[in-house]
Amino acid sequence: MTYTYKYPRPAVTADCVVITRETEPKVLLIQRGCMPFKGDWAFPGGFMNMDETTEQCAIRELEEETGLRLSNVHQIGAYSKVDRDPRGRTITVAYLTIIDKPIAVTGQDDAAKAEWWSLSDLPHLAFDHYDIMQDAIRVYAQAVEEYEKIQHDRFKEQKERMHELSKQIREQCAHVQDLCSNFTKKQ
């Protein structure tokens, strides 16, 4: 027996925000090749298949629309404004991935183009992608801050190890000098 719900089911999509870790960060956008918002820019993304998770959907759509194959994405939020998609009730789950520098991409599938854009010079974005961008930048800033803290802590840890090693070497050298001095006195 098939169970049916008396409630309507919204569509579920996933979007993937890819930002570079550079002095002047860039974000990957696709130019939509079909309605709605044909010609506007958006994050790579699309509708979730029934046999995949939203994370798998984001990774698949990123590759389908840009040719970029990444597997390390982090969820930044779910977006469910009632009127966010003119096609009907749609909820999207957005993911973020940070890469070192832009990688060659091409618009594929229903994306007319795929390009890297400076965060300081964004084009008009489709749907509610400004909201997603705002959250992605917040998460990106936290990730960069955490990365810098980890690097600082690693450097501090390495510095402490080097100091300890240097101390041990000085002690060993002093010991060797004592041995040499004692040996010379005995002769």
Give each language-model segment a name:
Residues F183-K185:
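Long, low-complexity or tandemly repetitive, helically biased scaffold regions used
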